[in-house]
């Protein structure tokens, strides 16, 4: 068992040891119908193998709809546990490349989707301001956001480790 991981989760009020592996979580998961997400396996792996669960791609397939958590006969906060596992994974530098890219874009330009010249042109053709009312339009706000993200150490969190 991954005692350290279980202690971390339990400290957050997420006790996974009462799971009886009935599979209701997996059977009721809307995301699992279309992806490889198997919540029961994630819970099992969290109990057995820290490295495996934190580096599992499927950990990121959960849409956080809370269906599994609402239907769990033992009342295990499964979705909350998955969110905490994700937080732990990110702290260890384990992040999907797509998430890292979006995070880097936010750090760089204050927005997950940067504006390119083509998008600005299309906006103008539609009668819109080429730059929407976001921090991208206000250099002072952008600098404020960057300062906030650095103060929160978001830049360190998303840096490749």
Swiss-Prot record:
PROSITE patterns for the chain: 4FE4S_FER_1 (PS00198), 4FE4S_FER_2 (PS51379)
Comment on bound cofactor: Binds 2 [4Fe-4S] cluster.
Cofactors demanded by this protein: [4Fe-4S] cluster
Residues reported to bind [4Fe-4S] cluster 2: 29, 62, 65, 68
GO CC terms, sorted: cytoplasm
Catalytic activity: coenzyme B + coenzyme M + 2 oxidized [2Fe-2S]-[ferredoxin] = coenzyme M-coenzyme B heterodisulfide + 2 reduced [2Fe-2S]-[ferredoxin] + 2 H(+); coenzyme B + 2 oxidized coenzyme F420-(gamma-L-Glu)(n) + coenzyme M + 2 reduced [2Fe-2S]-[ferredoxin] + 4 H(+) = coenzyme M-coenzyme B heterodisulfide + 2 reduced coenzyme F420-(gamma-L-Glu)(n) + 2 oxidized [2Fe-2S]-[ferredoxin]
Pathway involvement of the protein, from the record: Cofactor metabolism; coenzyme M-coenzyme B heterodisulfide reduction; coenzyme B and coenzyme M from coenzyme M-coenzyme B heterodisulfide: step 1/1
Main location: cytoplasm
EC number(s) recorded for this UniProt protein: 1.8.7.3, 1.8.98.4
Biological role stated in the UniProt entry: Part of a complex that catalyzes the reversible reduction of CoM-S-S-CoB to the thiol-coenzymes H-S-CoM (coenzyme M) and H-S-CoB (coenzyme B). Catalyzes the transfer of electrons from ferredoxin to CoM-S-S-CoB during methanogenesis from acetate. Electrons transfer from ferredoxin to CoM-S-S-CoB via HdrA2, HdrC2 and HdrB2. In addition, the complex can use electron bifurcation to direct electron pairs from reduced coenzyme F420 towards the reduction of both ferredoxin and CoB-CoM heterodisulfide. This activity may take place during Fe(III)-dependent anaerobic methane oxidation.
NCBIfam families for the chain: CoB_CoM_SS_C
UniProt subunit comment: The ferredoxin/F(420)H(2)-dependent CoB-CoM heterodisulfide reductase is composed of three subunits; HdrA2, HdrB2 and HdrC2.
Name of the protein: Ferredoxin/F(420)H(2)-dependent CoB-CoM heterodisulfide reductase subunit C
Designated gene of the protein: hdrC2
